[in-house]
Amino acid sequence: MSQHSNYQMTTASDYYSTKPVLSAIRSHKLISSVFEGKCPSDYESAWSPTSPLDFRLFSTLGNPFAASSSRSIWRGKQRSWDSGKVGLSIVHSLVDDHHTDSSATIVLPSPDSKNIIFGSLMRSGQKPHLLSQPFTKALMPKDVIPNAVFEIGHDVIDVLELRKSGSVDAAYCSGAENFSVNNNACQVTKQDPGSLNGGTESDMEISEDYTCVISHGPNPKTTHFYGDQVMESVEREELKNRCCKNEKESIFAVAPLDLTTPVDVLPPKDFLSFCYGCSKKLGMGEDIYMYSGYKAFCSSECRSKEIDLDEEMEDGDEEEAIKSVSSSDKESKKKSNGVFFTVG
């Protein structure tokens, strides 16, 4: 009787000891049935969201026995994927870029990052130094607003530096008559040419960089070029007398067009109404044969006659030119007693 009771007790203990194992096996089968047909890539995509909204969709996936731990993990990841910055950036892009008020500076409230100021509100690393009002009024024109600052990139150009460099003369800004504007190409001045570069007028005329241009006509003008400097309307008589009274040989001369003499270059208004060869009237709808631009003919025969005449005239002119050249050569040989000299 005791053996039977011991057997029953042993069986009962075995039964109670194997019950948790069976429940674990059943739970394992349940979990495997839930994730049946899933590949490893699906789990990786579930743990790699592409936007902050994917956390809610994939929050139900995971170990059902570790729900609290998975929620804490998702909360930590969601904190690193904070969407507050994205929203503020979108709102800031809708703000007018021309609004430069200091109150419009947006600072992102993030404890893990530093304050960020957008580039549209930044102008320079250091504040520009404004000039004093009387100094700018003395150097700048009247139509310029006082306290103006020239700003290029991150550097501030002072008007005083421009004056020292010589790019803008203060007399020009003040409205004086004697002024000079310097640049890399040319200089236009109304000053005395005798004091240019410390040289005299004779040295300037002998130099290869000197050129004198004289314009004749109703408004005569003499222009002197010396290097990169241009001098107009020189009033000194000494330079005018030496330069403009044919004491020096000019390189070339361009005569102005005399518009007072009639020039027969335009055809008559009715040149299409008659034949240029036989003077026959040309009616409407008839064939017209043109030659030399403004000569109209009634037939091709009349036009060919005119072409032959022009060719004979051209040949005669060439023969006369050849005869004149040969006669001049003979006369030169006679004067030189049979000795022909060449230049070179």
UniProtKB/Swiss-Prot annotation:
Superkingdom of the organism of origin: Eukaryota
Cell compartment(s), UniProt: Cytoplasm; Nucleus; Endoplasmic reticulum
Bias kind Acidic residues: ranges: 309-320
Keyword DNA-binding: no
Molecular function (Gene Ontology), one example: zinc ion binding
UniProt KW keywords: Cytoplasm, Endoplasmic reticulum, Metal-binding, Nucleus, Zinc, Zinc-finger
Mutant lacking the gene: phenotype: Reduced biomass and lateral roots and shorter primary roots.
Region (Disordered): 309-344
GO cellular component, one term: endoplasmic reticulum
Record carries keyword Endoplasmic reticulum: yes
Primary location class: cytoplasm
Tissues where this protein is expressed: Early expressed in hypocotyl and cotyledon and preferentially in the stelar region of the shoot and root. Later expressed in root-shoot junction, lateral root, old or senescing leaves and in pistil and pollen of flower buds or open flowers.
Zinc finger (FLZ-type): 270-314
Subunit description: Interacts with KIN10 and KIN11 via its FLZ-type zinc finger domain. Interacts with KINB1, KINB2 and KINB3 via its N-terminal part. Forms homodimer and heterodimer with FLZ2 and FLZ12 in vitro.
Stated family: Belongs to the FLZ family.
Function statement: May act as an adapter to facilitate the interaction of SnRK1 complex with effector proteins, conferring tissue- and stimulus-type specific differences in the SnRK1 regulation pathway. Negatively regulates KIN10 leading to a repression of the SnRK1 signaling pathway.
UniProt name for this protein: FCS-Like Zinc finger 10
Source organism per UniProt: Arabidopsis thaliana
Gene behind the chain: FLZ10
